[in-house]
Every structure is written in structure tokens, then in C-alpha cells.
């Protein structure tokens, strides 16, 4: 009883850990037997008390946490604000997703932490509370789902579903929540079956690869090892111990002079502790990788058996054990037992908070601005940063680790508990990160704009994928495009206003073309792809009625459907204006599908005076047949200018043009066939044939006449001259006339009746033999050349254009020299005469005009149609701003310039009507031109994509000074402000717009110094006007809907009247073309604007074309071209971002499988196969061919094996599954043990492309004494199991019929070495007890001795070369040349292979 008094009385709730402690103390005191007796009594007591308490779980015991309501409400409020930010374009979709996930995750976690205090206060003996904290059943996070909120779920792929389940299981789920819950629940209703079968199939494939691996020897005699260093703490302690225990040493280990462990000794805990204590040199251990055979393994390379802790027994089927060990956790873990039913758990960042109110100070050089993962502005610090918080009397110093975000600015005042920095969650979440792509799709249709330069990503140079260099917005400018294919002529000009009724009326006259560009889907015109290419007939009667009888020289766009000139379009700086001639006089339409004006700009974009601007191929001078051009004895001089050098894909071609001084020339047709040497010709030289005579087997003549056959280099030229043959009487008379043109009206020289000729003829003398000759009279087509087709009339005249400034001279060039033959290629036609426009200008005013001018194409695009303008700058600019490829500062300034090298696709360029004359009017400045200092006023035109406007000359001094001042400060300012779609004209008298019919007031400043009086003096036109074709000016109501050239825009008009005192603090300038995000305040009491682009600015109102911004961060990929029309649902951007995975094996299994099947996991990760190719090439280059292959393959295989083992282990460890390395090593050894015979050195033994075992390749090479070239290759497990040596095993795995048929054709032999083959055939498996007989038999029969001539050839030479690389290369050295029973033979055991 005295003892009883000394006992301590505990009155405490006892939980799992306390019970453990109690039991261990009981065992120490009383031993096992007595303890078990005591525990039985405890158990009985427990049951008795539980019965008495009648603890049961009822639904009433699930108490919801009272704070849940407002916590959820708060989270919803935050989500709403986030949604708004996304709508305004402040954060992009990925940032929004991340932030919303973290908001809900934090809410859910907070609720979980609230749960315990809540139970403790309200009901400490609540059965649910007792159960969840006893450790007996259930844990806090499961109970949290019952009484807190279920939270975020992950779908079967482990992706987060960003809609959280707000209810808990006590309240019950809504329908949506239930479906989401099914995805993520344990034994999930949605995906368990699929997962389990996946895991089973993985196990099956793994076992298939390694089923034949059995322990067959005690020691294979290898000298290699893999070194593990205890000094470099790259591995965590636990993993280091796991790696060593149970392995066998490959080398002796010395500590100074003393040997502390010998080769082939297995490592136990004691040895590991000594290694760790002594920090010895790297320890070399044997692993399955070092074992010398691929078809079995020896005891020492395998090490200890995991079951009984001793060296593995002979005959143990370690392959199957390895396959099962890797596959089995997969089957277990698919059930999602790991986490509570797929509920998302991720790490959020730690926050550093300010301890008291004060001012922040830090070194600004150590940080640089960035965006946080949620899109907030922050500073990123590179190294440890000390932040000092100063208040009046206290100074506090906070150390912030590198790679953290600082959320405050220098000298900012912070309040107590304000978050000043965010420390990224530590390494424990690193293995739960993965990189994924997310595509963002467009919500509305419209036109694409971006506000910064973009790069082409290198692998997509010619497509529409661009990379963003910095954070910027992508804008989708709203506007529905009217889908007619192509407008064959366009009466409305760019930015006219038309009513919808007119559009629908016009649609009937539009023919639909089907255009298919196989590279990119162009939305230039929605095309009807019809299967039959049917020619459509235009209804021209209607068309004529529309055009009317007036001034009918139109050039209108038509798409060349199938046109030879498309080739010309593909050259960089050449554009074609296809047009049809409408001849007004005869009221008939001559339609030539091939006619068009082609303009060509020199590569550098500089025209000299008198250079050719454009050329026009007149269809009248086009021939379908070959022939010779003649223009008699009249003089012609050929001109070749520098501008005519066409650079096409880097090859320069100089094409001479012949300028004619004559008014006519002659074309003598002939039929030409160019045949290859080998073709058999069915007609003789100088014979006369009729029409449709077969010439060769598959060609027939199209005309009749005389045949001439000439043999040139490697080809035969066969000509057929049509015409009549005369045999002249007197020889000398004809010789004078040989090869001349005879005009009509003269008599024939050699005929009796002197008949007058009606047409021109060409007389040619032909002598088939020396004595015999005759004359061939050939028909001639004469061509008249007028004094030049006056192309100037094709363009409507600009009434205010100064005619004497820019001159266009039309000159006719003949393209073929006198007597030069013209050749027709396949089905194209030959152009004989080209009419060229020669550009020149007056040089009266020396100051303003230069010898050279800059020219460039500007593409202006309105939805559905592209317009290209030629821009010629006559003004000598003082300041040049030339766009560089990645210069961000000019991003808003530079229009989309066609002469720019960094261009997009110039293949389709459609010219619109009446554009070119505009380019020649006086003084067109460009974006290159700033205000010219020596003139009073200067006009400036900027054509940017789909935004065109023109600033006229400013005569008003006040306004001019403002601009001058701003130029002095920053010369780029005025251009920024002036960029915009519509223009201004101070005086209508000196500016007539032929293709900007909308003239608007340009810019209204809201600044104080810009008062309305000044504005009225500067700009007399305050409303905008429409100028009709005949020069009348219409003023119209600004509130009407405005349509941009077949594009329906959504307009938004804020009306507000400015007052003088109205904006004293703010001095915002609204400029044309500016993009405005939603809710930006322009002025204090001004309206809140919707997002869009400012289109028209007036004194009292602005018009905004509504647009939707999408934010994109650096590294994002933009799809589509600038200015392209996008439709709803098109892909806009692709982001690549890191995200937390839910810590669940749902990702584990696919990942393991991807590694084992050697598939690239995603486009970003390094692909192992690529790495292997690189290794192979480098080593071979360094060491030359034979050694390079041996060593290259060895090194590659060693590298990739270690890499693969680490990858697989990483996946399993992240799921908390411990698998011993040696199991993975056995599998990896099988998938890396094959090499691919390459074609570099052709050997007699193996075919190129054959897969053979690495050791077999080495041994064959030694036996043949010649190098076999091979390179390492990674097989996936499926391929490896279909490339084993046993066809029975392969056939039982997959593709049975194929494998058996192949084996039968090749006559393959199965040696029945694996387990599976023997099971299939009902034999005894060669493992366990059935193992001994196999070895005994093979020793007797399979030792075939081959005599070798050079005994020590390999041993000596290789040792000299590679003695210092012993660890890696000694596989190929002496040990393979073991002596059998004293004679010099090499024993090759075929059961090894």
C-alpha cells in the first residue's frame, strides 16, 4: 500500500501520443508479457467507459463555425474586386486564377484553425471533437470538411477547379458543388476505375521489361562503381543513408593509411555511421548499373535482399520484385487516400508585417520593379535586403531573404501590421510546382492591336506566333465585320460613313471568291470554300448601273484567283494592283484577269530621281506562244539601273530593259519544244509536218511547218516554223533578203505575178545542204506602241494638288532584245511590252527636295480589306527616327511600315481605288519628319494601321509655339499626341481630302493653359464634316451610328462641356488614337469612360471605339497578326506559368509513366532524348570515330541512367512513397541497355538502325577487331518489352500476331531464359529451385571457344589511352579478357547476352 501512495494521480485527457509514451515506459519497467496484460485491461476499461458515456456520432454534433458566414462573404467580395480588375485589364487570367485560388485557400485554412477553439469553448466533449483530436480516426482536415467548408477541389488531372465548394457536408452541397465534389472525392465517382487500370497496366509493362532478370551468379567480376560522396551534402541525410545501406562496396576505402572497409563488403548501419563521421573520400558502390550482364544480375551488384537483410539468394527473381515495387504504390495511391479526397492543399506565401507605424527605408539599388504572381506592383530583391522602419523613437530592422517581394516603396509611411514584404514559401513546395500553358480566348470579335513591339519566336519565324518582351495590353477593337468575300469594287472609301441598308443592297452584286492560303488562316475575307472550282459569271448589267456613266476610270480591287502574278507578290517589296479596265466609250467590260500595275520598291526604300516607280503589263502585248521579237534596224539602247536589281531570297538577278524609240515592233511566232537528251524524237530535222503531228511519245505539234532540231548542252531544242516555202530561182537576190521583214504593199521578188502583200511577212533563208536552199516566208504580228499609255488618267485628279511638283512619265520598255527569242514556260503567257511609270520631281526649291526620296508601303487595314498606300517623302527630314526591332520607346510612334524588314506576311496586298495619286501630292511628310526648322509651317501625315489622319499646316502662332516648346523638351511628344485615326483641317480651302472624308478637330486639351479662345483661333473647324465626291460639304449629326468601311463599330459618346475653371489640377490631354482603360478619370467631374480607343475629339465631346483590353506579361505568346480580325473564341495569348499541384498521386502516376516511357513531359522541360543526341555528337567529335562511339555511348548511358532514377524517385518521394533505388535501377538498366547501330561505319555484322545490347556490341567489336558505330538510345518501357530476346514473351505482351509472324519470317530462336516464356510453355521457371539445373546445363554446352590472333591487343592499347578514366571506362579492359584454364582463349558465353 505504501507503493500505492507514491503513485501520481493524472487527471488528463489521454490521446494517441500519451498512450505511446505510457506503453514504452511500461515495457521498460515490466517487460513485454506484463505490459500486454496491462494493455488488455486498459482496452476493457476504454470500451466499458465508452459504453457508459454512449458516445455516438449524430448529425447534431456537427457544429458549424459561427464565423464562417462573414469569412465566405469576405472572400466573395475579394473575388468580385478581382473580377473587376481583370475586366479593366489590370490583371490577366492566370494571375486572376492564382489569386482567387489563394483567397479561397486562405479562407478554408482559417476556418480549419477556427474549428478547434470553437469546439473547445462551446462543447469540449463533442464526439466529433474528441474523435478528430484523439488520433484514433479522422483528422482535422477531414472534420473541417464536415463542419467548415469543403474548399477547393482538384480534377482528375490534378488541375485546380477555381470554383470552391463553400458548403460543408453538414449543410449539404448544391448540385454544382456535388458534381465538382465527385471529381475530387476519394474513390472519386468520376475517375477511380480509370486510374486503377492505368496503374495496373503500368505494373504489367514494368514486369514485362524485367521478368527475365534473376540472380544467377555470386560475382560478375566488374571493377566499376558509382561514387557517392559523403562530403558534398547534395543529398539530404535520410536519402544518403538509404542509398548506402544494403549496397556492396566496389573499392577499398581508406582513412589515411588505414583501410576501414574492403571491396565486396556489404554496407550496414555501422559502416554508414563511420563514413559519416570520418567524411571519407567518395565511396564507390556497386549497383545493378555496374553489373556486366543485361540478362541477369549477380548477388554483389544487387546487394542485400530487402526482406531478410542478407545478401540476396541465388535464383531470386529480382526483376519481377522490382517491377511490382514500382507499380504497386500506383494502384494504392490512385484511390487518393493520401489527401482527403483530392482537396487542394498548397503553400501560400509568408508575410512580413510592420511592427509599428513608421517610415520605410531600404537600398533601392538592390531591388528592381516587377509584378507579383497576383499582378500587383512590387520590388524583387536579388540578395538579402535590410529594411529599416523608423518611427519617432524606435528604429526596427527587418532582414528580407533573396527572391522575396517588397510590397512598399522607399520612404513610404506604413501602418502597424501592414504587409511590407512577401517571402516565397520555402523549398517544401518546390517539388509541387509544375509549368503549364494556359490559352486565353477572345470574348468578342474585333480587330487586334497591341501596344508594344513583339518578337517573332525563332521557331515560328514565318507564322503568326509572337513573343512579348514586356508587360503590355492586347486590345480587341470592337466591330463586326460584314462577311462578304471580296468587294470587287469599292464605292465607299476608307472611313466613309454608310448606312447598313446600303450594305445589304450592295451585297447582291458581290461575287464570292474562294481563296485558300495554306499557311495562315487569313480573315481578310470570309471565303466560301467550294469543292468545285467553278468560274462564276459576273452580273455586269447590274454593275454598270451602279457605276453609272460618269468618270469611269476605276482601279478597283479584285483578288487574283489563280494567277501567275502571285509569285511576284511573294517578293518582299513588290506589290501588284490588280485591276480591270472598264472602257467607258464602248460600254463594254474588257476583263483581263492578269492585268495589274506592279509597284516595286528598292530594298533600302530609297528612290533616285528618274527611277521606275511602277510598271503596267498591258494585256494587249501579251502572247501565249513563243517567238522572236524584231524591230528592224532601228536603234535601241538597253538600260539597266541599280533599282532593277531584284533581290529575291538573296540571289541577285539583273534583268535588262530595252527602251524603244520606235512606235511599233513585230512578233514572229514559232513553236518551241525543249526536250531532254534521252527523249526519242519522231520527226527529222528540216522536215515539214502538219498540225497535230506526234513529235515525241506524248507531245504533238500545235502548228504545221518546218522542223528545226538543235542540240544544246544536255537538252534538245525543237522549233517548228509555220509559213510557206518558196524555192527561189536566183540565189544572190535572195541572200540580201535573208532574214528581213517585208512590209505589205510590196510585190514578191521571185514570183511571176507580182501580187501585193496584205500583211507583213518575215523572209528567212534556209540551207539544209550546201547546194540546196529555200526560203521560208513566215507570218508576222505587228504591234503598235502608242506614245505611252497615259496611266495618270487612271487616278482621279486631286483638285488641290500642285501639278508641277511630282512628275510621272510613262515610258514603254520592250522586254526582249532585237532578234532575241522569247520562251514561254508551261502555261504562262509572255509579256512583250511593259509600260513603266518613271518618277521625277522638280528641283526648283533646293532646300526642300533631295536627290533621293524615301518610299515605303503602308498597309492600312480596315476589317475585311487591306489597303496599301505608297508613301513618298519629298521632305528632307532633320530628325530621323528609324524603327529598331526591339526598341520599346518607339512603340506608339511607328506605323506598320511595309519596307520594314521585321514584317509580317506581305503575301496578300489588295490595293484599293484611287490611292496612288495621294502619294504624289506636295510635301508629304511621314513619321520620319518632325517640324522643319527653316519653314514657317509644315504638314505631317502619319498612316498607322487602320488609323489615318493628316495634320495640315499650322499658321496660328500660339498653337505653333506650344508644339515648338514641347519639341525642345522631347522631340517625340507631338507625334505621340498626333497619332490617331482621323485628321484635322484648320482651313478647308487649303486641304481637300480625297480619301479621308471625315475631317475632325484633332485634339482637345484639358490643360489650363489651353483655353477655348486659343482653340477657336487655331482651329476654325470644330465639328466634323463629310466631303462628298463632288466637293459639297455635309455637316451631320454626331450621334448617328458610324460605320467604318463595312465594319459595325460600337460607338460611345460622352458629351461634356469644358469650362475654363474646370480642370485646374489635372492637365490630361486626350489625344486621338489613345487607348483608355475603363473607369479612367479624365477630369474631376468628367464622366467615367468605357475602355476603348479615342476616335474623334471635339470641343465638347469625344467618340470612343469600344475595345477590350487583355493584359499579357513577358514571355507570353501572342497568336495572330497586328490588325487581324479575330472572331469570338479565337486564341489570343498563351501564358506559361508555374502552378502548385495538389499533393496527390493523381499527378504521380502519369508523371512516372511519362518518365518511364521517355516522353517529354511538357514543351518546356528538357527532353532526355535530345540530351542524349547532344552527348553522342560531342564525344564523337572529340575522340574520333571508333573510340568516340564506344565512350560516347558509355558516358551517355551513365548520364541518362542517373538522371532517370532521380526523376522517378522525385515523383514518388513527393507523394511520400519510399521505394529503394535498386528497384528503379533494374528497370532503368533495361530501358537504357540497347544501342542503335548507326550508318557512319558500316559493319558486316549488324544492319544500320538495328537495336542491339550494349555489351553485345562491345564484345562483337572486340571479336571482329573492327569498330562498330553505334549510339545510345532511350527506349520506353513499351518499346523495351517489345525488343527482348524472347519472341514468346513479346507475343504474350502485345501485338501477338505481328510479333509471331515476324519471328517466323526471320526464323528466330527463343532460348527460354526468362520466366514468362517457360510459364507460357508450361516448363519449370528458371528461378528459385528451378535455377540450379539451368546453370549446370549452360556451363557444359554453351562455352564455345574462339581463338584470337592478337591476345593482348585491347588490354594494352586501351589501358594506355584511358588509364586516367578508370572509373568510367574500364568495362572494356582486361577483365573481359579472362583466361580460361591457362590457354590464351577468349571465352564468350552466349548465355551472357
From Swiss-Prot:
Cofactor(s) needed by this chain: Zn(2+)
InterPro entries noted in UniProt: DNA-dir_RpoC2_beta_pp, RNA_pol_beta''_euk, RNA_pol_Rpb1_3_sf, RNA_pol_Rpb1_4, RNA_pol_Rpb1_5, Rpb1_funnel_sf
Catalytic EC class: transferase
Pfam families per record: RNA_pol_Rpb1_4, RNA_pol_Rpb1_5
Record carries keyword Metal-binding: yes
Keyword Nucleotidyltransferase applies: yes
Gene Ontology CC: chloroplast; DNA-directed RNA polymerase complex; mitochondrion
Keyword field: Chloroplast, DNA-directed RNA polymerase, Metal-binding, Nucleotidyltransferase, Plastid, Transcription, Transferase, Zinc
Protein location: Plastid, Chloroplast
Gene3D superfamilies with a match to the protein in the record: 1.10.132.30, 1.10.150.390, 1.10.1790.20, RNA polymerase Rpb1, domain 3
GO molecular function: DNA binding; DNA-directed RNA polymerase activity; zinc ion binding
Enzyme Commission no: 2.7.7.6
CDD domains documented for this protein: RNAP_beta'_C (cd02655)
One BP term from GO: DNA-templated transcription
Binding note for cofactor: Binds 1 Zn(2+) ion per subunit.
Positions with a binding annotation for Zn(2+): 220, 291, 298, 301
Catalytic reaction equation(s): RNA(n) + a ribonucleoside 5'-triphosphate = RNA(n+1) + diphosphate
Subunit structure: In plastids the minimal PEP RNA polymerase catalytic core is composed of four subunits: alpha, beta, beta', and beta''. When a (nuclear-encoded) sigma factor is associated with the core the holoenzyme is formed, which can initiate transcription.
Function as written in the Swiss-Prot or TrEMBL entry: DNA-dependent RNA polymerase catalyzes the transcription of DNA into RNA using the four ribonucleoside triphosphates as substrates.
Family stated for the protein in its record: Belongs to the RNA polymerase beta' chain family. RpoC2 subfamily.
Full protein name: DNA-directed RNA polymerase subunit beta''
Gene name of the encoded protein: rpoC2
Amino acid at each position: 500500500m505504501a507503493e500505492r501512495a507514491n503513485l501520481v494521480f493524472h487527471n488528463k485527457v489521454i490521446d494517441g501520443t500519451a498512450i505511446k509514451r505510457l506503453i514504452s515506459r511500461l515495457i521498460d519497467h515490466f517487460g513485454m508479457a506484463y505490459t500486454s496484460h496491462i494493455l488488455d485491461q486498459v482496452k476493457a476499461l476504454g470500451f466499458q467507459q465508452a459504453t457508459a458515456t454512449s458516445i455516438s456520432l449524430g448529425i447534431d454534433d456537427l457544429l458549424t463555425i459561427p464565423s464562417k458566414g462573414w469569412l465566405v462573404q469576405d472572400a466573395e467580395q475579394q473575388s468580385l474586386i478581382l473580377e473587376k480588375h481583370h475586366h479593366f485589364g489590370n490583371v490577366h487570367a492566370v494571375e486572376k486564377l492564382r489569386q482567387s485560388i489563394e483567397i479561397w485557400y486562405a479562407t478554408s485554412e482559417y476556418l480549419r484553425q477556427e474549428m478547434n477553439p470553437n469546439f473547445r469553448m462551446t462543447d469540449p466533449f463533442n464526439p466529433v471533437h474528441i474523435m478528430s483530436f484523439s488520433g484514433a480516426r479522422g483528422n482535422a482536415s477531414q472534420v473541417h470538411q464536415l463542419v467548415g467548408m469543403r474548399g477547393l477541389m482538384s480534377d482528375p488531372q490534378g488541375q485546380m477547379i477555381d470554383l470552391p465548394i463553400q458548403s460543408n457536408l453538414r449543410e449539404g452541397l448544391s448540385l454544382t458543388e456535388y458534381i465538382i465534389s465527385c471529381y475530387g472525392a476519394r474513390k472519386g465517382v468520376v475517375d477511380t476505375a480509370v486510374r486503377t487500370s492505368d496503374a495496373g497496366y503500368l505494373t504489367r509493362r514494368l514486369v514485362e521489361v524485367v521478368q527475365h532478370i534473376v540472380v544467377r551468379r555470386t560475382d560478375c567480376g566488374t571493377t566499376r562503381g558509382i561514387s557517392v560522396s559523403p562530403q558534398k551534402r547534395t543529398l539530404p541525410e535520410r536519402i544518403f543513408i538509404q542509398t548506402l545501406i544494403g549496397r556492396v562496396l566496389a573499392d577499398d576505402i581508406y582513412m589515411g593509411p588505414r583501410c576501414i572497409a574492403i571491396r565486396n563488403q556489404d554496407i550496414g548501419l555501422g559502416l554508414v555511421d563511420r563514413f559519416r563521421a570520418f567524411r571519407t573520400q567518395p565511396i564507390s558502390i556497386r549497383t545493378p548499373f555496374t553489373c556486366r550482364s543485361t540478362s541477369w544480375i549477380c548477388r554483389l551488384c544487387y546487394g542485400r535482399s530487402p526482406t531478410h537483410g542478407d545478401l540476396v539468394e541465388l535464383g531470386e527473381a529480382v526483376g519481377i520484385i522490382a517491377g511490382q515495387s514500382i507499380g504497386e504504390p500506383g494502384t494504392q495511391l490512385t484511390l487518393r487516400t493520401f489527401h482527403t479526397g483530392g482537396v487542394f492543399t498548397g503553400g501560400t506565401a509568408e508575410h512580413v508585417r510592420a511592427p509599428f507605424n513608421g517610415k520605410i527605408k531600404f537600398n533601392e539599388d538592390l531591388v528592381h520593379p516587377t509584378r507579383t504572381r497576383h499582378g500587383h506592383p512590387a520590388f524583387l530583391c536579388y540578395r538579402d535586403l535590410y529594411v529599416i522602419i523608423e518611427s519617432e523613437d524606435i528604429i526596427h530592422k527587418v532582414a528580407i531573404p533573396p527572391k522575396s517581394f517588397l510590397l512598399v516603396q522607399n520612404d513610404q509611411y506604413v501602418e502597424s501590421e501592414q504587409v511590407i514584404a512577401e517571402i516565397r514559401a520555402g523549398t517544401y513546395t518546390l517539388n509541387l510546382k509544375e509549368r503549364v500553358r494556359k490559352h486565353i480566348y477572345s470574348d468578342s470579335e474585333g480587330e487586334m492591336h497591341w501596344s508594344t513591339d513583339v518578337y517573332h519566336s525563332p521557331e515560328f519565324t514565318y507564322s503568326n506566333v509572337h513573343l512579348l518582351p514586356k508587360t503590355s495590353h492586347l486590345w480587341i477593337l470592337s466591330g463586326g465585320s460584314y462577311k462578304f468575300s471580296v468587294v470587287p469594287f469599292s464605292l465607299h472609301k476608307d472611313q466613309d460613313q454608310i448606312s447598313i441598308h446600303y450594305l445589304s443592297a450592295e451585297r447582291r452584286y458581290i461575287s464570292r471568291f474562294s481563296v485558300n492560303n495554306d499557311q495562315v488562316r487569313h480573315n481578310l475575307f470570309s471565303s466560301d470554300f467550294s469543292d468545285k472550282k467553278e468560274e462564276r459569271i459576273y452580273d455586269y448589267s447590274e454593275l454598270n448601273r451602279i457605276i453609272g456613266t460618269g468618270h469611269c476610270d476605276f482601279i478597283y480591287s479584285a483578288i487574283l484567283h489563280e494567277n501567275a502574278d502571285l509569285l511576284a507578290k511573294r517578293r518582299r517589296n513588290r506589290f501588284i494592283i490588280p485591276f480591270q479596265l472598264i472602257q467607258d466609250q464602248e460600254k463594254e467590260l474588257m476583263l483581263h484577269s492578269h492585268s495589274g500595275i506592279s509597284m516595286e520598291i528598292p530594298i533600302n526604300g530609297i528612290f533616285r530621281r528618274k527611277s521606275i516607280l511602277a510598271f503596267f503589263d498591258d494585256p494587249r502585248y501579251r502572247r501565249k506562244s513563243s517567238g522572236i521579237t524584231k524591230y528592224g534596224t532601228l536603234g535601241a539602247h538597253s538600260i539597266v539601273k541599280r533599282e532593277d536589281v531584284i533581290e529575291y531570297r538573296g540571289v541577285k538577278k539583273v534583268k535588262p530593259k530595252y527602251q524603244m524609240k520606235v512606235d511599233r515592233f513585230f512578233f514572229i511566232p514559232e513553236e518551241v519544244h525543249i526536250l531532254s537528251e534521252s527523249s526519242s524524237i519522231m520527226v527529222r530535222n528540216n522536215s515539214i509536218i502538219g498540225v497535230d503531228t506526234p513529235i515525241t511519245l506524248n507531245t504533238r505539234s500545235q502548228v504545221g511547218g518546218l522542223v528545226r532540231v538543235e542540240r544544246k548542252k544536255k537538252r534538245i531544242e525543237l522549233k517548228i516554223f509555220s509559213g510557206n516555202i518558196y524555192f527561189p530561182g536566183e540565189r544572190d537576190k535572195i541572200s540580201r533578203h535573208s532574214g528581213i521583214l517585208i512590209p505589205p504593199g510590196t510585190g514578191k521578188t521571185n514570183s511571176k505575178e507580182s501580187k501585193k502583200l496584205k500583211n507583213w511577212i518575215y523572209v528567212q533563208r534556209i540551207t539544209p545542204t550546201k547546194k540546196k536552199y529555200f526560203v521560208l516566208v513566215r507570218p508576222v504580228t505587228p504591234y503598235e506602241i502608242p506614245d505611252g499609255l497615259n496611266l495618270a488618267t487612271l487616278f482621279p485628279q486631286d483638285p488641290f494638288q500642285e501639278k508641277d511638283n511630282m512628275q510621272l512619265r510613262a515610258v514603254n520598255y520592250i522586254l526582249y532584245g532585237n532578234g532575241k527569242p522569247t520562251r514561254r514556260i508551261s502555261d504562262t503567257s509572255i509579256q512583250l511590252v511593259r509600260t513603266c511609270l518613271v518618277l521625277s520631281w522638280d528641283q526648283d526649291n533646293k532646300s526642300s527636295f533631295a536627290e533621293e526620296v524615301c518610299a515605303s508601303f503602308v498597309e492600312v487595314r480596315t476589317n475585311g480589306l487591306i489597303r496599301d498606300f505608297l508613301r513618298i517623302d519629298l521632305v528632307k527630314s532633320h530628325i530621323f527616327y528609324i524603327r529598331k526591332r526591339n526598341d520599346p520607346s518607339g512603340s506608339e510612334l511607328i506605323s506598320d511600315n511595309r519596307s520594314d524588314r521585321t514584317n509580317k506576311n506581305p503575301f496578300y496586298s489588295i490595293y484599293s481605288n484611287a490611292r496612288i495619286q495621294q502619294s504624289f501630292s506636295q510635301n508629304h511628310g511621314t513619321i520620319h519628319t518632325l517640324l522643319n526648322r527653316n519653314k514657317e509651317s509644315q504638314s505631317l501625315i502619319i498612316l498607322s494601321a487602320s488609323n489615318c489622319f493628316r495634320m495640315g499646316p499650322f499658321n496660328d502662332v500660339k498653337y505653333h509655339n506650344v508644339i515648338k516648346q514641347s519639341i525642345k523638351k522631347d522631340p517625340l511628344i507631338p507625334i505621340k499626341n498626333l497619332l490617331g485615326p482621323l485628321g484635322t483641317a484648320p482651313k478647308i480651302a487649303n486641304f481637300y481630302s480625297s480619301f479621308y472624308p471625315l475631317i475632325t478637330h484633332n485634339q482637345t486639351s484639358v490643360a489650363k493653359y489651353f483655353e477655348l479662345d486659343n482653340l477657336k483661333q487655331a482651329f476654325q473647324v470644330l465639328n466634323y464634316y463629310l466631303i462628298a465626291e463632288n466637293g459639297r460639304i455635309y455637316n451631320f449629326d454626331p450621334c448617328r451610328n458610324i460605320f467604318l468601311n463595312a465594319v459595325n463599330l460600337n460607338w460611345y459618346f460622352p458629351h461634356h462641356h469644358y469650362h475654363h475653371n474646370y480642370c485646374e489640377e489635372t492637365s490630361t490631354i486626350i489625344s486621338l488614337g489613345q487607348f483608355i482603360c475603363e473607369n479612367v478619370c479624365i477630369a474631376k467631374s468628367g464622366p467615367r469612360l468605357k475602355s476603348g480607343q479615342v476616335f474623334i475629339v471635339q470641343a465638347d465631346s469625344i467618340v470612343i471605339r469600344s475595345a477590350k483590353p487583355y493584359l499579357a506579361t513577358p514571355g507570353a505568346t501572342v497568336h495572330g497578326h497586328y490588325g487581324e480580325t479575330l472572331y469570338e473564341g479565337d486564341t489570343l495569348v498563351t501564358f506559361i506559368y508555374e502552378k502548385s499541384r495538389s499533393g496527390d498521386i493523381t499527378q504521380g502516376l502519369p508523371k512516372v509513366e511519362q518518365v518511364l516511357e521517355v516522353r517529354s513531359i511538357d514543351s518546356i522541360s528538357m527532353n532526355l532524348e535530345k540530351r542524349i543526341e547532344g552527348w553522342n555528337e560531342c564525344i564523337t567529335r572529340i575522340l574520333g570515330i571508333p573510340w568516340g562511339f564506344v565512350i560516347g555511348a558509355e558516358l551517355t548511358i551513365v548520364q541518362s541512367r542517373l538522371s532517370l532514377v532521380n526523376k522517378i524517385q522525385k515523383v514518388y518521394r513527393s507523394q511520400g512513397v519510399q521505394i529503394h533505388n535498386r528497384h528503379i535501377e533494374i528497370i532503368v538498366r533495361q530501358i537504357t541497355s540497347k544501342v542503335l547501330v548507326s550508318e557512319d561505319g558500316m559493319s558486316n555484322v549488324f544492319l544500320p538502325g538495328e537495336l542491339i545490347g550494349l555489351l553485345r556490341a562491345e564484345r562483337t567489336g572486340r571479336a571482329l577487331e573492327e569498330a562498330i558505330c553505334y549510339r545510345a538510345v532511350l527506349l520506353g518501357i513499351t518499346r523495351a518489352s517489345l525488343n527482348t530476346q524472347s519472341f514468346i514473351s513479346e507475343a504474350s505482351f502485345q501485338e501477338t500476331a505481328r510479333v509471331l509472324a515476324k519471328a517466323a519470317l526471320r526464323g528466330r530462336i527463343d532460348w527460354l531464359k526468362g520466366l514468362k516464356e517457360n510459364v507460357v510453355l508450361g516448363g519449370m521457371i528458371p528461378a528459385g529451385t528451378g535455377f540450379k539445373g539451368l546453370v549446370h546445363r549452360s556451363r557444359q554446352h554453351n562455352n564455345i571457344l574462339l581463338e584470337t590472333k592478337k591476345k593482348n591487343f585491347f588490354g594494352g592499347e586501351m589501358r594506355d589511352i584511358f588509364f586516367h578514366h578508370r572509373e568510367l571506362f574500364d568495362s572494356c579492359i582486361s577483365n573481359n579478357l579472362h583466361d580460361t584454364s591457362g590457354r590464351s582463349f577468349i571465352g564468350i558465353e552466349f548465355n551472357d547476352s
